[in-house]
Curated annotation (Swiss-Prot):
This is Uncharacterized membrane protein Rv3760. It is found in: Cell membrane. One of its GO terms (cellular component) is plasma membrane. It comes from the Bacteria. InterPro entries: LapA_dom. It is a multi-pass membrane protein. Its main location: membrane.
Length: 117
């Protein structure tokens, strides 16, 4: 029995290792797999955060703005007008992306059919 609390009998000696372990190396954990479900949940969370920010933006920009297009004239709240412009831009992007995917799919089918001959 000593008066030094750091050298108690309950603590292992500093140079000892646990049987079956490699000294100085932490046990490896298996890598986390990337799944489609994880991607969907991540996209949903990001989408909801963007939606919340968009709703705050629309609520803060309620001043009416005048618009004219090919002789038509109307007024909308500024936040709603910007939302409609963003939705229109997104739809144009979707249509362009769909056309490109169909184009690539058609080319891949031709290449696959030519390879089978």
């Amino acid at each position: 029995m000593t008066s030094n609390p750091s050298s108690s009998a309950d603590q292992p000696l500093s140079g000892t290792t646990v049987p079956g372990s490699v000294p100085g190396k932490a046990p490896e954990e298996p890598p986390v797999k990337f799944t489609r479900a994880a991607a969907v949940w991540s996209a949903l969370i990001v989408g909801f955060l963007i939606l919340i920010l968009l709703l705050i933006f629309i609520a803060q920009n309620t001043a009416s703005a005048q618009f004219a297009f090919f002789g038509w004239r109307w007024s909308l709240p500024l936040g709603v007008a910007i939302l409609l412009a963003a939705v229109g831009g997104g739809l144009i992007t979707v249509f362009a992306g769909t056309a490109r995917i169909l184009q690539l799919r058609r080319a891949a089918k031709k290449t696959h059919a030519a390879a089978l001959r």
